[in-house]
Amino acid sequence: MSGRERLDEEDARILALETATIAGHTCKIAIVDPLPGGAPLAALRERLTARLPRVPRCCQCLAPSPSGAKKETALFWRDDDEFSIDAHVRPARTSAGGPTTRAELLDHVAAVMAGRLDRSRPLWAIDVVEELEDGGWAFVWTIHHCMCDGMTSMRWATELLWDEHPADASAPAAPAPKPPPANAVVEARWLRAAALAEHTPAAMVRELRPVEARSPFGGKIGTTRAVAFAHCGIDELRHVEKTAGDGVTLNDVLLAVVGGGIRRWLVDRHEGVHTARVKVPVSMHARTPDGDTSGNRDSFMFVDVPLAEPDPMRRLRAVHRETAARKRRGDPQTLYSVFEALGRVPALGRVATRLTMSPHEFTLNVSNVPGPKEPQSMFGARVRELYSLAEIAPRHALRVSAMSLASSMFIGFNADPVIVPAVDELAADVEASLAELLAVTGGEGL
C-alpha cells in the first residue's frame, strides 16, 4: 500500500462522528507478567519498526484532497514521510513515583479515552506502563476506529505485537484469495439486491423502532471518562450455555450477564428497571462479495434485555429468543446492505448513522470481539489480561466491550462519570451476575 488511497465512505462516517466531547478511538489494554529489567520500551519500538511494513496503514496519515475539499469524504491516506516510532510508542506517565497501582492504571486509561489522537500523524499510539505493583507491566494501545474495527485490530496485534513462535515464523504465508470472477460478483450483487427487497421492510420495523422506557444512561455527554474492568472464565460462560441448552450461545450468556449486572446496579440506586435495548455489533468480515478482511465491516442488531425479570435463566432465555429471531431472519446482513448502499450518498449516510445512534433507538452498546484462542506472550512474558474499550456515543453514557484471550473473557466499561457514577461498582455487579447464573446452573467452583 503506497501513494494515496481515498478514505472510504464507512470510515469517513466514523471519523465524522468525532466531536468536542466524543472521541473516535478505541483502546486495547494488555497486562503482562514481570520481565527482568521491567517493561521493554526500547525492544517494543524495535519490534514495531521491524513489523510495521506488515500493516502499512499504521505508517499512513490522513491528508486533504488535492482539490482542497475539507469534508471527511475528501480525505486520503498517504504515507507519513516524517514517521517516528518514538512519537507512537512512548512511556506512560501514570505515577508520581514508584510502581503504578491498579487505580492509577485505570485513571491513565480513562485519560487516554478522553483524549484525542494527533490527526497529523498515523492514528495510533502505544503508552507503555513500565512497572505495576506486582512487578508486571502493561501497555495501552490507542487506535482510531476509522482505521480498523475490533476484528481487524486483533489481526494487527498478531502481526505487530505478540511473540512469534518458530512454527509461525517458518510457516509459508497463506496465498492471497483469488478474487471471484466478475460475473460471480455481479450475480452475487443481484441476489443480494433481490433478498434486500424482500427482507428490508420487516427488518427495519424490527430493528429501528423507538425505545419506550427512559434510558438510565441518557444525558448530555461531557469531556471526562471513567473506566472499569471485569473478567470471567470462558469455561464458566460455556457451562451456562450448555446448561441452558435450546441453542443458547456464549454471546447470549454474555448479554444476559451484562443485563443482570445493570439490573443490580440500577436496583442498588433505586432506579426503575425496564427493558434495555442493547445494540450488538455483528462482524461482516468474510461475508462481502470481494472477501474483504480489512478496515471496518460491522453491522448490528438490537436485542431487548428484560431488566425487570428477576430470574436469571428466564432473562437468558428471553435474550436468546431475541438474538435467534434476528439471526434467523438475517437482520444484520440486511441492515449492512441497506446502510452500505445509503453510505454511497454521503448525505444519506450521515442521516442513517444519526438514526442508528439515536438515544430513542437503544440504551447501550455491548460488543464481543474474539481475541486470541491461545495464550500470548511478549518478549517471553505471558499476557495475562487483555481488555478492550470503545468510545461512548451522544446521549449514550455507557459502553461495554468484551474480548477473549485463551480461556478468559475480559470486559471493559467506558462511561461518562457524571451520568454513570461508580462504574467500578457496575463492573463488580456484572461479575456478581455471572455468579448468580452459575449458582442456579450448578456451576459454582468452576
Regions found by a protein language model. Give the residues of each.
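Soluble acyl-CoA-dependent acyltransferase catalytic core bearing the H(X)4D motif
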Residues: 1-10, 29-396, 400-431, 435-446
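Intrinsically disordered, low-complexity linker and terminal regions at domain boundaries
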Residues: 13-17
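TRNA-binding/sensing appendages of the translation machinery
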Residues: 20-26
